[in-house]
């Protein structure tokens, strides 16, 4: 028989750096989940992605056990890494902070495809380009139609 799901918790934690301090401790502790056990499992599974911010969805059950799924880093974080800037523009429509190519957009879109709600790489590229635009990061050139 399947376990009874008590709820979901969504967090963004740096890979290999989960610890019982906020935001992890209070979020899990209030639900009765073993914080140290989660931290050990998360850190073990994310050692290869150390330092990158990773979204994690924790499913906890009525018997206080849990499972979790680690997603790919957010598009905004990947865009900042590719553009080599620390933050987006305060005025994205007026002031651009960086410029990236469509090839870089394609790479991010292919990496993020599993988490996005789209069926084609082109649709994912448009989503990534929209995020870049809202952050003040310009995309060089025209959208590649036949690629």
Swiss-Prot record:
Task: Quote the Gene3D superfamilies the UniProt record gives.
Answer: Ribosomal protein L11, C-terminal domain (1.10.10.250), Ribosomal protein L11/L12, N-terminal domain (3.30.1550.10)
Q: InterPro entries annotated for this entry?
A: Ribosomal_uL11, Ribosomal_uL11_bac-typ, Ribosomal_uL11_C, Ribosomal_uL11_C_sf, Ribosomal_uL11_CS, Ribosomal_uL11_N, Ribosomal_uL11_N_sf
Task: Report the Pfam families cross-referenced here.
Answer: Ribosomal_L11, Ribosomal_L11_N
GO CC annotation terms, alphabetical: cytosolic large ribosomal subunit
The alphabetized UniProt keywords are:
Methylation, Ribonucleoprotein, Ribosomal protein, RNA-binding, rRNA-binding
PROSITE patterns assigned: RIBOSOMAL_L11 (PS00359)
- One GO BP: translation
Q: Which GO MF terms are attached to this record? A: large ribosomal subunit rRNA binding; structural constituent of ribosome
* CDD domains from the UniProt entry: Ribosomal_L11
Q: How is it modified after translation?
A: One or more lysine residues are methylated.
What is said about its interaction partners and assembly? Answer: Part of the ribosomal stalk of the 50S ribosomal subunit. Interacts with L10 and the large rRNA to form the base of the stalk. L10 forms an elongated spine to which L12 dimers bind in a sequential fashion forming a multimeric L10(L12)X complex.
Q: What does this protein do?
A: Forms part of the ribosomal stalk which helps the ribosome interact with GTP-bound translation factors.
Question: Sorted alphabetically, which NCBIfam families does this protein's record hold?
Answer: L11_bact (TIGR01632)
In terms of PANTHER family, this protein maps to: 60S RIBOSOMAL PROTEIN L12 (PTHR11661), LARGE RIBOSOMAL SUBUNIT PROTEIN UL11M (PTHR11661:SF1)
Would you identify the family this protein belongs to, as annotated? Belongs to the universal ribosomal protein uL11 family.
Q: What is this protein called?
A: Large ribosomal subunit protein uL11
